[in-house]
Amino acid sequence: FSYTSLPPRSRDEARAKSSTASSIASSIEEYGVANTSMQQASALTSLNGKPLIVLTADEGADDQWQSKQDHMATLSTNSLRRHANATHQSLLDDEADAAVASQAIHDVVSAVRTSQPLAAR
C-alpha cells in the first residue's frame, strides 16, 4: 500500500493506524469470513430499488470482469455503472481515484437519505 499521494498528516496517520494490532486483526478477520460473504453475495438475486453504483477499476479489467460488473448493476432497478481509469488499489491510495470512489459512495448515501433515484453524472 502506497501512502505517497496523501497529505503528510494523513499519510502519517494512515501509516500509524495500519500497523496497529487491531488493524491487523481486522484484516485477518475480514479474510476469514470472505468465503461466507462471497457465498451470500452470489446467492443475492435482487436489491429491488435500493441505490447501487457499480464502480469498475478499468485498468487490467478483462471482458469477463466487465461482464460480471454489468451483471452486478442489474441487481437493482436504481443502479448506475461507472468506470474509473484506475486500479483497485489506486481507488484507495491515489487522491484523484479515491475522489471518484468517494463520490460514488456519497451519491449512494444521498440517494438513500433523500429517497431519490440515482442521477447519472
Located regions from the model:
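Catalytic active-site module of serine/aspartate enzymes centered on a nucleophile-bearing elbow/loop
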Residues: 77-121
